[in-house]
Amino acid sequence: MMGGICSRKRDQPVIEEGGVSRVVSGRYCKSSSSKWLGTSFFRSTVEQSPGVAGICPSLLELCISKICRDIDKYSSLSLLPRDVSQQIFNELVCSQSLTHDSLQAFRDCALEDVGLGEYPSVNDSWMDAICSQGSSLLSVDLSGSEVTDAGLALLKDCSNLQSLTYNYCDHVSEHGLEHISGLSNLKCLSFKRSSAISAEGMHTFSSLFNLEKLDLERCPEIHGGFVHLKGLTKLKSLNVRCCKCVTDSDLKAISGLTNLNELQISNCNITDSGISYLKGLQKLNMLNLEGCNVTSACLESISALVALAYLNLNRCSLSDEGCDKFSGLTNLKVLSLGFNSITDACLVHLKGLTNLESLNLDSCKIGDEGLANLAGFVLMKNLELSDTEVGSNGIRHLSGLKNLEKLNLSFTLVTDSSLKKLSGLTSLKSLNLDARQITDAGLAAITGLTKLTHLDLFGARISDSGANSLKHFKNLQSLEICGGGLTDAGVKNLKDLVCLTWLNLSQNCNLTDKSLEVISGLTALVSLNISNSRITNEGLQYLKPLKNLRSLTLESSKVTASEIRKLQFAALPNLVSFRPE
C-alpha cells in the first residue's frame, strides 16, 4: 500500500474504496485571508461523528492525523514516502499548526508544493528548510511573508521550480529579484503589490523564457519595464490590474507577444490609442479593460480580436456609438458593460452573440424594449440588470432563458405582478430582488424556484405573512431580508432552511431573543447579522449550537461585546469576527 503511494505522480487522482476520488499532493486548503478561516480536509474527515453510518477515515488519513498531533516528537520525516510527507505538511499548514521548529522535520523530504501564502511568521529562517527540497520543489507561495533578498537567494538550488508566488511582500529589493533570474523552468510568477518591481528590476524577467503567466497587479513602478518582456514568447497570461503607471507605450512593447490569451489591464492609464496595439494578439481569449480611460472608439480595435470569449468593459465611458463592432465578436461568452452610458440601442448589436453565458448591464440606461434583444440568449446563465430602468414589461423577454442561474433585478422598476413571468426559470440558483416595491405577493410568485441557493430581499417589504413562502426554498444557503417587516413570528418560517450558511436579518427592529431560539437549529450558519434589533445578552445562549459560526453582527442591539467574547470562548471556537467588538 505504501509502495503504491510512493509511486504516484504529481496531482494524480487516487480512487479509494467506495469510489471516492481524491488528488495526492494537491492543496487541500487555501486561505483567502490572514485569519485562516479554511478548515482542513483531514480534520473534517477524521473528526466526523463516529455514529454516522458508512463514514470511516482511511488508515492513511488516521496515520497522518496522528503524526500531525505529535509533530513535535519527530526530528525528521525524510524516510516517509514523499506524498505522505506532502499531505502531512499540507495538513499542518491548513490547521495553522506548522511552526519554524516543526518545519525542520521536513528537511530533504522532496516536497513538491510549499504553500505558505499569508501564513504567520514566515521569514528568512524558514527558507533553508524549504529550499532543502532541492530539485523536487515545483511550487512555492510566500505571499505576505517577511522573506528578504537573503531568503530568495536560497531558491537558486531549486532548479525545477515552476511556480513562485511572492505577493504583498515589502522586504525584497531589485537586487533580490536577480536571484530568480536563473530559475529557467519557471512558468508562473506572481509579485502582486510589490514596490521592488520597477522598470529596471523587470530586466530579471528577460531570462525566464519558459514563463507562461506573469502577475504584477498593483505594482506602482513598472512603467517602461515592459520592453524586458519582449522575448517571453511563451507568455500566455499577463496581469497588471490597478497599475496606474501603465500607459499606452507599455502596450506597444508587448504587442508582439502573440501567444497571449489573457490580458488584465483594468484600472490602468490606457487610452483608445493604446488598445490599437493589441490588434495583432489574435489568440487573445480574455481582455479586461475595466476602469481604463477608453471610449467607444476602442471598439474598432477590439473588433479585430475575434477569439475573445471574455471581455470586461465596465466603467469605460462607452456610449451607443460604435457598439455595432460587438456584432462580430461571436465567440463571446462573458461580456461586462456595466456603469456605461449605453442604452437599448446598443443591445440591438448584441442580438447575434448567441454564445453569451454572462452579461453585465449594471447601472446602464437599459429599459424594457432593450431586453427584447436578449430573448435568443438560450445559453445565458448570469444576467446583471441592477440599477437599470427595466420594469414589468421587460421581464417577459427573459421567460425563455431556461438556463439562467443568476439574475439580479435589484433597484429596478420590476413589481410583484411581473415576477410570475420568472416562474419558468427553474434553473435559477441566485436571485436578487432588493427593491422596495417587492412585497409578500412577489415572494409568493416565485415559490416554484426551488433550486434557489441565494435569495436577496434586502430592501423588499417582506412581512411575517410573506415569510411563510420561504419554506419552499429548502436549498437556500444565503438569505437577506432587511426591510423591517419581520417579527419573531416570521422568523419561525426559517427553521427548516437547514442549508443556510449566510443569514442577514438586520433592520428588523422587532426581533427578540425568541428569534435566536429558532436560529439555533441552523447549525450550518457561518455568518449571522441581526443588527438593529431587540436581541439581548440573555439570548446569546441560543447561539451555542452554531459551531460553524465565524461572523456575528449584532450592532445597535442590547448585546455587549464582553458577552459575545464569553460566548466565543465557551462555545464558538471558530468565531473570528463579531460586532459590537
Where does each model-flagged region fall?
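Cullin-RING E3 adaptor/co-adaptor recruitment helices
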Residues: 2-128, 132-139
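Amphipathic alpha-helical protein-protein interaction segments
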Residues: 49-57, 74, 78, 145, ...
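Short, solvent-exposed loop/turn at the beta-strand->alpha-helix junction
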Residues: 94-100, 120-125, 145-152, 170-175, ...
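Alpha-solenoid helical-repeat scaffolds
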Residues: 94-208, 212-218, 222, 227-231, ...
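Conserved hydrophobic beta-strand positions in leucine-rich repeat
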Residues: 112-117, 138-142, 162-167, 186-192, ...
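Leucine-rich repeat
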Residues: 133-134, 157-159, 180-186, 194, ...
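Compact recognition or signaling/catalytic modules
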Residues: 184-193, 198-199, 206-249, 255-320, ...
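Leucine-rich solenoid repeat scaffolds
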Residues: 539-581
